[in-house]
Amino acid sequence: MRHNVSGRKFDRPTGQRMSLYRNLVTDLLNYEEITISEPRAKEIRSMAEKMITLGKKGTLASRRRALAFVYIPGIVDKVFEDLSKRYAERPGGYTRMTKLGPRQGDGAEMVKLELVK
């Protein structure tokens, strides 16, 4: 029984799953909106918000933590320079999920995950 077990495995080994998360967060921070399945969006939403919170701290240690997670160094610069200023007065809730309906091929519930303007 899976009582009080959090997180999703997406039927992948740990390395593949973490790589999936890192790629999706990198894409969200780069394009500021992505269309993905609802379970994946729910899983990466908190990770993306943590990256923006690291950007708001602005310390060298937080920059290094962000560089260890996000694949493209230019996106870390975007988080620390642009997004941190945009969300300076906002205490959290940097993302929005909008339901788009089921996917044509397999019926998976799709959402648009975007950064709040």
UniProtKB/Swiss-Prot annotation:
Fetch the Pfam families from UniProt: Ribosomal_L17
Q: Does the keyword Iron-sulfur apply?
A: no
Superkingdom, taxonomy of origin? Bacteria
List, alphabetically, the PANTHER family matched.
LARGE RIBOSOMAL SUBUNIT PROTEIN BL17M, RIBOSOMAL PROTEIN L17
Instruction: Give the protein family.
Output: Belongs to the bacterial ribosomal protein bL17 family.
Tell me the HAMAP family matching this sequence: Ribosomal_bL17
Write down what this protein is called.
Large ribosomal subunit protein bL17
Q: Which organism is it from?
A: Dehalococcoides mccartyi (strain ATCC BAA-2266 / KCTC 15142 / 195) (Dehalococcoides ethenogenes (strain 195))
Q: Which gene encodes it?
A: rplQ
